[in-house]
Amino acid sequence: MNDLIAAADSVYSFINRTAEKVPEGYRWKTVDYTDHPQYHFNVFNGVGGIPLFLRDYHLLTGNTRALELAEGAVAWCISDNPEVCNHQRGVQLGKTGIASVCLYLDGLSGSGTLHPFCQSNAAHLLSEPVGPITDLLSGEASNGWFFLKLWERTGADLYLQGAIRCARWISEQLIRDELGTYCLVNPDGSWGRVPYAGLSHGTAGVAHFFALLFQATGDATWKAVAHELLETLVRHAIPDHGGLNWSIKLGEKALLRCQHSHGASGIGGVFAKASAALGESDLLKVAAMAGEAAYQYGDFRNNPTLCTGLAGSGELFVELFKFTGNEMWWDRAKEFARLAMGYKASLPEGDCWPTDTAGLYSADYAYGASGTGHFFLRTLRPLEFEMPLL
């Protein structure tokens, strides 16, 4: 396992070397969705997700500089007010994600002190109407997920009711037709009238939120909704590479993706976690079939990242090892981690870790070093470190 430790150390060295000290804290120049450089707070591919790796790297190594960088990154993100995409709501694209990262860091101290930004962002969410986006990436499923995390931390009923408020609104947007039960990303159809299947924008991500809400409340209403959504996904599962995979949108047949955001790697993780949340072992069998497809696809996108690459599929293997105890899945996670190590670039300035575009390097979470590095940490300690955004 020394090679995994060395890989995590390499990711940290890249993040530490590229950190920029500014009056507000620490920031990094990351790469946006169109492959252009940016300074942005978002968790998805901005500065906001970098502390997720740094926090757990600190726990693994005791490196206090990693924690300093993580706290400085949060401080900068809270202060950042970009001219574009300055969303206050949503976990991966909005400031709710920074509040979620604050929660993740707060757990280190054991003091019970809650970062004030968690409360202020929650108050902002509660002050506005619910909607219009449904998904887990940064819609109401993500906001409901944040409320559940905040309720777990504080026990305050206000936050549980916030999660229920999100769930009720999503329930009102559900469509039941020949495709099954689903919701559109935006009920007004601006994202199209054909529903997505996957974790980021689709049925799987919304099902995950409802399963967690049932686990928190014991309310059979939410279990029934989770069931409907998961059963829809089972209906649309397509045999592929010896396992199961999903098209990007329900009802389509083309299998274009098998990754964390779209396809078996992310959807399998939802089924694995739902098996525990709903107490149903059959769901774990679906997760294992998704895992088989993800393994057989291998490095089909030719990158190490969480969103589209090896780390995203490897994370499913870690989850399957945790839930089944079958060491085959841990071995597969280690195999994918070692494939991901091969993408490290040793440049004159030091080690660099790529995005899913060859020749571009970034410290961010979904498309950069932090997500890849966190997968290394989870592969090292699969029973200790959790997926922080799931």
Features from the language model and the residues they span:
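Glycan-recognition and catalytic cores of secretory/periplasmic carbohydrate-active enzymes
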Residues: 1-390
